[in-house]
Amino acid sequence: MPKVLIVHDYLNQVGGGEKVLELLLKLFINAEVYTLTWDRKLFPKINPKTSFIQFIPLKKRYRAYMPLFPTAVKLLKIPENSLILSSSHAYIKNIIKPKNSLHICYCLTPMRYAWDSRSEYLKRENVFLRPFIALFLAYLRHWDKKGSENVDYFIAIS
């Protein structure tokens, strides 16, 4: 029997995606949870495996660490022979799928700031940082497209 893993972008805010995660945890009570960063106060009943982002100071300003998120996802070690259920709106669906594993992604929404809303996103950023952010978003689109090829099945709600 494969080990069930639930992977979620980050657990530092409460929203619709986190409600989906709670439902998945009710369905798969023995599942292990993986995430990039976790706020214990918001999610005291979940004890996830986290990325190195968890240990960076000023986690509340996680947007400043966005360029590190693809590397953080890549470095999360997933055991072989796993059933990976990702609940994702951004990064975690690109987790590296090990041998003999199945990855089903419950895609909450595409990474809109990298795809269809990038011009609106850039308008809100510092004018001097925009060229660098635009380059990062181009890289992110490439990484997102390539990473989605490792998902076996998508379930989309948005």
Give a label for each model feature:
Residues 83-85, 97-126:
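Active-site proximal beta-strand in glycosyltransferases
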Residues 5-8, 56-61, 125-133:
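Short, basic, glycine/proline-bearing loop/turn elements
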Residues 88-89, 109, 155-158:
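Helix N-cap/beta->alpha junction signal
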Residues 123, 129-154:
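Membrane-proximal helix-turn-helix segments that form the acceptor-binding/catalytic region
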Residues 2-12, 36-37:
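Nucleotide-activated donor-dependent transferases that construct or modify glycoconjugates
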Residues 17-27:
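Short amphipathic alpha-helix
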Residues 27-93:
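Active-site donor-binding segments of glycosyltransferases and PAPS-dependent sulfotransferases
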Residues 13, 41-43, 92-96, 112-115:
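Short catalytic/ligand-binding loop motif for oxyanion handling, primarily in non-cytosolic enzymes
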